[in-house]
């Protein structure tokens, strides 16, 4: 019974911390607001991303499938050669932009830069770390051992592995931190012709997103271009937004926020709880080992059980 009691104590600690440890961002954390309602699917963001991150084009698969030569780039999804990807939603005759029925729309896939990243928690060698100031999830190739735990842990299937390389690395978007270090912004935001990809501080982007979902469909709104700090705008007709900001709560929140006129599940985005898997697992660990009470109690129970077993066998 005492052995069971020790086990129950441990289980009790696990239950009490299962809600997890919630993490917050610094006031200077940066991110991207992607507004699918004003995206035209031109893929200028993809081309710019490849150019400024030295990523090679992917054309072999499409050329092989279509028999057409000379296609510069057409990746199917995120890969070790593609850090962001515009995907198309279609329904019925796809005649109306931003319509769930018989319509079409676009969504952009890239690293979400989670507030509490599962990939960072899963990495055993801290090859993936979250920058304390910017919040960007950064990769250290020199620390990486190629275990690929981050790939399994990520709920968005973002990190990719260079299987074809002799010395492979993990590949993912880092919000063009090399450009930011020189005073620039992510290439996908700088070269987006409509403002669909918008750079800024996460707090400001959230404020902008909340403003947009309250807009009246059919009205005109001056959409900021490239970066919130620039002040450049482009007037456009407002689409019927879904009253939801994807990334505000998912998995504890993300620095990559999305708006759309189409339900996000139909765009291939996962439904996640408001708590990250990382916070749950770390909360359990911290709860169990806090003060070493549970391990000591468990050890005491096991020793008592062993003593009783030995005593009974000798008797």
Segments from the language model and where they lie:
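Non-ligating segments of multi-cofactor redox enzymes
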Residues: 1-315
């Amino acid at each position: 019974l005492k052995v069971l009691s020790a086990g129950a104590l441990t289980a009790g600690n696990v239950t009490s911390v299962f809600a997890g440890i919630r993490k917050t961002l610094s006031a200077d954390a940066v991110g991207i607001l992607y507004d699918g309602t004003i995206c035209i699917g031109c893929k200028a963001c993809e081309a710019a991303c490849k150019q400024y991150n030295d990523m090679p084009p992917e054309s072999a698969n499409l050329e092989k499938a279509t028999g057409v030569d000379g296609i510069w780039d057409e990746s199917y999804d995120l890969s070790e050669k593609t850090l962001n990807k515009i995907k198309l939603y279609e329904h019925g005759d796809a005649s109306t932009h931003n319509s769930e029925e018989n319509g079409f729309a676009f969504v952009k896939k890239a690293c979400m830069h989670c507030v509490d990243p599962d990939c960072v928690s899963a990495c055993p060698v801290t090859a993936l770390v979250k920058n304390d100031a910017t919040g960007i999830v950064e990769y250290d190739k020199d620390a990486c051992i190629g275990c690929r735990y981050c790939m399994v842990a990520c709920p968005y299937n973002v990190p990719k592995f260079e299987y074809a390389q002799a010395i492979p690395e993990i590949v993912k978007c880092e919000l063009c931190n090399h450009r930011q270090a020189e005073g620039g912004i992510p290439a996908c935001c700088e070269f987006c012709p409509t403002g669909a990809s918008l750079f800024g501080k996460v707090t400001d982007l959230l404020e902008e997103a909340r403003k947009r979902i309250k807009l009246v469909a059919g009205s005109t709104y001056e959409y900021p271009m490239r970066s919130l700090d620039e002040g450049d705008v482009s007037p456009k007709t407002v689409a019927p937004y879904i009253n939801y900001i994807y990334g505000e709560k998912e998995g504890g929140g993300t620095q990559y926020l999305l708006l759309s006129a189409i339900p996000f599940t139909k765009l291939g985005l996962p439904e996640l709880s408001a708590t990250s898997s990382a916070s749950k697992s770390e909360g359990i660990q911290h709860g169990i080992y806090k003060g070493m009470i549970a391990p000591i109690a468990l050890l005491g129970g096991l020793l008592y059980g062993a003593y009783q077993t030995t005593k009974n066998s000798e008797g």
